């Protein structure tokens, strides 16, 4: 019986440091995204987005984000792809919920087609936004990530303003 108590005490003591290390080494997410591309009439697109991030410490990480969206308003097929990279700043204090903000830069591929005719462009894109990682249940390794981003892209000397709203599953990998 004494041996069992010593084993239980040792397990509890070894578990304390591992519980305190809550910063994942990396994150991967995939989910649904709604993209509103503004312009003279505006276009609503639905799609999927995903990201992979490396967390250098508990507040700073580098993220790559990819999204593919499609819609057919006005009988015209629109497809947009965003691919951006940059820093993410997270706040991991006193809560299981981890809010974050990010500033990403990259490209925006946009194509439209109707009746066998099509056009496309590939302008510079930038994205500023944020969200929060909310654990699902008692498992800190899988969570839900609601996110809101402003996406701008430069084409022909002007900036088009867009908004993306996403809900994704996030998977926390390893520990820092």
Residue ranges and their predicted role:
Residues 6, 156-167, 173-176:
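Short glycine/proline-enriched turn or capping motifs at secondary-structure junctions
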Residues 19-56, 62, 66-70, 105, ...:
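Short glycine/proline- and aromatic-enriched beta-strand/turn motifs that initiate or cap beta-hairpins
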Residues 1-23, 174-176:
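Cleavable N-terminal export/targeting peptides
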Residues 19-21, 37-43, 73-78, 114-121, ...:
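Outer-membrane beta-barrel domain signature
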Residues 51-146, 150, 166:
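Gram-negative (and chloroplast) outer-membrane scaffold detector with strong preference
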Residues 10, 32, 163:
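Extended interaction regions within the primary functional domain
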């Amino acid at each position: 019986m004494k041996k069992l108590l010593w084993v239980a005490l040792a397990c509890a003591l070894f578990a304390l440091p591992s519980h305190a290390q809550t910063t994942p080494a990396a994150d991967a997410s995939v989910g649904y995204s709604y993209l509103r591309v503004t312009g003279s009439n505006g276009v609503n697109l639905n799609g999927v987005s995903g990201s992979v991030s490396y967390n250098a410490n508990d507040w700073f990480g580098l993220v790559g984000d990819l999204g593919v969206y499609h819609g057919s308003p006005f009988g015209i097929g629109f497809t947009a792809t965003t691919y951006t990279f940059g820093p993410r700043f997270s706040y991991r204090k006193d809560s299981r919920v981890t809010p974050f903000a990010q500033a990403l830069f990259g490209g925006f591929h946009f194509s439209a087609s109707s009746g066998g005719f099509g056009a496309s462009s590939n302008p510079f894109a930038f994205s500023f936004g944020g969200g929060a990682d909310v654990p699902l249940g008692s498992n800190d390794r899988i969570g839900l990530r609601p996110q809101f981003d402003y996406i701008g892209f430069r084409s022909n000397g002007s900036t088009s303003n867009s908004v993306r709203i996403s809900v994704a599953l996030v998977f926390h990998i390893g520990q820092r």
